[in-house]
Amino acid sequence: MKLEVLPLDQKTFSAYGDVIETQEREFFHINNGLVERYHDLAKVEVLEQDRTLISINRAQPAAMPIVVHELERHPLGTQAFVPMNGEAFVVIVALGDDKPDLSTLRAFISNGRQGVNYHRNVWHHPLFAWQTVTDFLTVDRGGSDNCDVESIPTHELCFA
């Protein structure tokens, strides 16, 4: 099956998470007016006994064509990825309770100046780079195991 890749924007991505970007976002000045602060762009969630982690993930480019055969989710916390050097990247997401609802399966490509924050329990493809090795600033939870993985029928990404 083919899965069309759409441009990433907050309106079409909102059911799955937050788009982390400055475009069309409110800001205020700090540090004597030298800094524009784009405040509270994503909601980070962890359970009370867990803690928030900041990491860097170095992702390798996926082999082309990109074939999707599994999704994962994190029921105990959100997970954010922000490319550190302006690289575009692809995210693949779906809603669903115990298993991914394939009628909600979507793929998005960022513009290189956007990151994503997946809501808790949102099914998504494991992180990968698109065209080049990419470092991602990653914000997620530390604690016990927090990853459910489900196989799905194979889908091939189709770039419009």
Swiss-Prot record:
Gene3D superfamilies hit by this protein: Ureidoglycolate hydrolase
This enzyme's EC code(s): 4.3.2.3
InterPro entries in UniProt: RmlC_Cupin_sf, UAH_cupin, Ureidogly_lyase, Ureidogly_lyase_bac, Ureidoglycolate_lyase_dom_sf
Keywords in alphabetical order: Lyase, Purine metabolism
Co-factor requirement: Ni(2+)
GO molecular function terms noted in the UniProt entry: ureidoglycolate hydrolase activity; ureidoglycolate lyase activity
Pathway in which the depicted protein is active: Nitrogen metabolism; (S)-allantoin degradation
Catalytic activities: (S)-ureidoglycolate = urea + glyoxylate
GO annotation (BP), single: purine nucleobase catabolic process
Short name of any one Pfam family annotated for the protein: Ureidogly_lyase
Enzyme class: lyase
Physiological role: Catalyzes the catabolism of the allantoin degradation intermediate (S)-ureidoglycolate, generating urea and glyoxylate. Involved in the utilization of allantoin as nitrogen source.
Family according to the record: Belongs to the ureidoglycolate lyase family.
The protein's assembly and partners: Homodimer.
Protein name, entry field: Ureidoglycolate lyase
Record organism: Salmonella typhimurium (strain LT2 / SGSC1412 / ATCC 700720)
Source organism phylogeny: Bacteria, Pseudomonadati, Pseudomonadota, Gammaproteobacteria, Enterobacterales
Gene name of this polypeptide: allA
